[in-house]
């Protein structure tokens, strides 16, 4: 089983989230027809296999742990799909509210829940991803992958290992002391202007 360290954003979101205020990213799509539950489950499984971070779970830690780690499971621990039938807009809204009010656990993979709402005017697929695991763009990519898998369309992924490019400091951090000083000057100027 592979592991990858938490980056700075993972750490921040883990420590900000509270049980009474779950931090999740919620996206949904409505289709004009019917979504087949069996095909959707297959699409969810295929998406988990395609995206390593979709199979990530929080690695247990102990007193000697220096950094939090994600464990990348070979497969999901569960398939988090709830299926409901709604006859009114209020029932659709209730399904949505149920989904977004849940604190999606990161100790099991995947760290997201999906709800399929069957409705006479068209079905809904709702997705809620723990914000510690994914931001809005990552959640959009995950939903896009689920939809492509469902439709049997190609779902290309980059030809690099996504677990090796999660270090935000290496990607966007200052590369030298002068650059760091310049960034601090800009930050101080921004804070000074914002305070006025």
Can you annotate each of these PLM segments?
Residues 1-174:
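Non-catalytic N-terminal regions of enzymes
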Residues 173-182:
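Primarily interfacial, aromatic-capped hydrophobic alpha-helices that serve as membrane anchors
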Residues 182-196:
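Flexible, P/S/T/G-rich "lid" or insertion loops adjacent to the active sites of thioester-utilizing
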């Amino acid at each position: 089983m592979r592991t990858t360290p938490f980056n700075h954003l993972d750490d921040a979101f883990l420590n900000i989230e509270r049980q009474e205020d779950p931090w999740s990213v919620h996206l949904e799509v409505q289709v004009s027809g019917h979504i087949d539950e069996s095909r959707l489950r297959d699409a969810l499984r295929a998406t988990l296999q395609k995206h390593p971070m979709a199979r990530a779970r929080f690695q247990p830690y102990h007193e000697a742990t220096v950094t939090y780690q994600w464990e990348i499971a070979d497969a999901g621990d569960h398939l988090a799909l709830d299926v409901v039938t709604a006859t009114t807009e209020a029932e659709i809204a209730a399904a949505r509210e149920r989904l977004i009010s849940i604190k999606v656990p990161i100790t099991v993979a995947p760290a997201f829940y999906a709800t399929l709402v069957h409705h006479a005017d068209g079905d809904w697929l709702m997705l809620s991803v723990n914000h510690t695991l994914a931001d809005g763009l990552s959640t959009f990519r995950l939903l896009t992958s689920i939809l492509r898998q469902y439709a049997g369309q190609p779902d290309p992924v980059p030809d690099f290992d996504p677990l090796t490019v999660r270090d935000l400091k290496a990607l966007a951090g200052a590369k030298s002391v002068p650059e760091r000083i310049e960034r601090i000057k800009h930050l101080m100027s921004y804070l000074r202007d914002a305070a006025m």
